[in-house]
């Protein structure tokens, strides 16, 4: 065990501990650091091997235990250590970018299910069930802000909206879990790839450029299944399981089609030599602005059906 490896191990473990402290202590940075939480142990696993990784996990968990409590240490083990080791192992064994993303998302979802199970057992509450009181407080705060600006809303409509929002969020929690897993898998990959390139480590398996991303046409089988389940849920409205499966499957497919539409838009803008800043800005607006995301949703479906890139290339010839 040489000094360079010891220094790398200590550096990445301390970086992981610092990120965890920032997540627990600063709400504004929590989401960002949560999405890239696995990166330090992902790099340790790739760079230093299983023995050094085990030592790193022991050091990291000991630091968190000394700074907080056993429950917080469990969260750190699952979200930072275990998931980082999983991402690192997958990145070493994956043959291509698609395999990496598929298995990383599965590992991320599995880790979050374990975390939710542990949380439920220790606290006795279900994280999938959102407390209506919390939603009411959020909406009341928003209503107070609007009232100060001269915009008022009846309290009854706010309560109704709070109930609808609570029910909707509880219903779509599984799909939100999957989409969050996809986000942390992708962002961890991007950050780790950048670090590996800068430090000249062993390169991570490459993913195709965003403009070349294409879903296989058999994705429509999942769409047909979701529509069939949706019809069944309407025929048997008392079966909540059908409603949950249908709503979440449709939400995940909607996200996939929007990403497909964004990929096509990125491809077209690349051909037109649009600056990367403007392409990235369009992607952000396409995700958060509903009218644009709906158009991208339709475009994504057509692109999977007809491969619109071929049509674009033919017209440009």
Located regions from the model:
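Small-residue-rich helix-loop
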Residues: 199-256, 260
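Hydrophobic alpha-helical transmembrane segments
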Residues: 6-14, 54-58, 74, 78, ...
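Membrane-interface interhelical loops and short interface/amphipathic helices
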Residues: 117-169
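Hydrophobic transmembrane alpha-helices
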Residues: 1-59, 273, 277-280
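Selected alpha-helical membrane-embedding segments in polytopic membrane proteins
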Residues: 151-204
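Short helix-perturbing small/polar motifs within transmembrane alpha-helices
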Residues: 12, 76-121
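Long, positively charged, glycine-interspersed low-complexity recognition regions
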Residues: 239-317
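Alpha-helical membrane segments and adjacent membrane-interface helices in multi-pass membrane proteins
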Residues: 30-89, 303
């Amino acid at each position: 065990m040489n000094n360079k490896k010891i220094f790398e191990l200590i550096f990445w473990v301390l970086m992981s501990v610092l990120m965890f402290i920032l997540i627990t202590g600063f709400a504004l940075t929590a989401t960002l650091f949560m999405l890239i939480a696995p990166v330090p142990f992902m790099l340790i696993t790739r760079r230093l091997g299983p023995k050094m990784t085990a030592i790193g996990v022991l050091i990291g968990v000991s630091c968190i235990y000394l700074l907080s409590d056993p429950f917080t240490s469990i969260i750190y083990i699952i979200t930072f250590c275990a998931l980082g080791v999983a991402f690192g192992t997958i990145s070493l064994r994956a043959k291509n970018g698609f395999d990496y993303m598929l298995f990383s998302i599965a590992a991320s979802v599995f880790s979050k299910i374990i975390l939710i199970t542990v949380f439920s057992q220790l606290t006795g509450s279900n994280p999938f069930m959102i407390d209506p009181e919390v939603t009411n407080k959020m909406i009341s705060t928003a209503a107070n802000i609007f009232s100060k600006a001269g915009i008022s809303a009846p309290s009854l409509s706010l309560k109704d909206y709070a109930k609808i929002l609570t029910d909707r969020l509880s219903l779509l929690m599984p799909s939100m879990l999957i989409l969050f897993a996809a986000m942390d898998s992708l962002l961890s990959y991007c950050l780790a790839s950048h670090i590996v390139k800068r430090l000249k480590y062993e390169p991570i398996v490459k993913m195709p450029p965003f403009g070349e991303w294409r879903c296989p046409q058999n994705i429509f089988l999942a769409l047909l299944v979701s529509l069939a389940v949706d019809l069944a849920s309407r025929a048997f409205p008392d079966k909540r399981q059908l409603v949950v499966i249908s709503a979440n499957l449709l939400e995940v497919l909607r996200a996939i089609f929007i990403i497909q539409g964004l990929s096509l838009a990125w491809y077209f803008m690349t051909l037109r030599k649009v600056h990367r800043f403007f392409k990235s800005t369009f992607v952000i607006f396409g995700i958060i602005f509903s009218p644009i995301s709906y158009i991208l949703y339709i475009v994504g479906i057509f692109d999977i059906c007809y491969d619109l890139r071929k049509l674009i290339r033919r017209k440009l010839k």
